[in-house]
């Protein structure tokens, strides 16, 4: 019962889509209506509003971190922590508050990994940054980071059958699956690069960010 309740709370936390909330609060178009139509920081950046993109990134990462931190803070067993990690991630992917139309989970997964272990989170984030810097593809960076996250986990904690390690692996698999469309576009040379600004219809109010 304790695990079920913790997972439910984590799912509800994950269901808060900061891309949609921040965009609405700042008078911007719904990120599900333009660009990749993905409610995530990269797509919000395509609106031209850097501040909104940063707030989205921080918010999505924070909710992942918060859910796992709370589970650890209240002394829940590793099985519960693993369930919480998966639940908050699934909440972002399929948010009950937004008709189950969520993002791809990159920032939320990063927050979860930071809460599991700071070194694990930072190593994975650094992997994303390196790939993104050299290739300018957010999706490619996410895919590479997703592949390396379980490997970093094994390097740090060994090959023990810790439930949290399985949660990390499950998140990586889900993240790759959520990027299946991006994989097709990458192979076809049609994927948008970081900084590309796609037309976003303003939903009342001007956008106050600069074009990259």
Curated annotation (Swiss-Prot):
The keyword Transmembrane applies. GO terms for molecular function: acyl-phosphate glycerol-3-phosphate acyltransferase activity. GO terms for biological process: phospholipid biosynthetic process. It is an enzyme of class 2 (transferase). The chain crosses the membrane at residues 3-23, 78-98, 115-135, 155-177. SMART domains: G3P_acyltransf. Keywords: Cell inner membrane, Cell membrane, Lipid biosynthesis, Lipid metabolism, Membrane, Phospholipid biosynthesis, Phospholipid metabolism, Transferase, Transmembrane, Transmembrane helix. It is found in: Cell inner membrane. Its EC number is 2.3.1.275. GO terms for cellular component: plasma membrane. Catalyzes the transfer of an acyl group from acyl-phosphate (acyl-PO(4)) to glycerol-3-phosphate (G3P) to form lysophosphatidic acid (LPA). This enzyme utilizes acyl-phosphate as fatty acyl donor, but not acyl-CoA or acyl-ACP. Belongs to the PlsY family. HAMAP family: PlsY. Probably interacts with PlsX. This is Glycerol-3-phosphate acyltransferase.
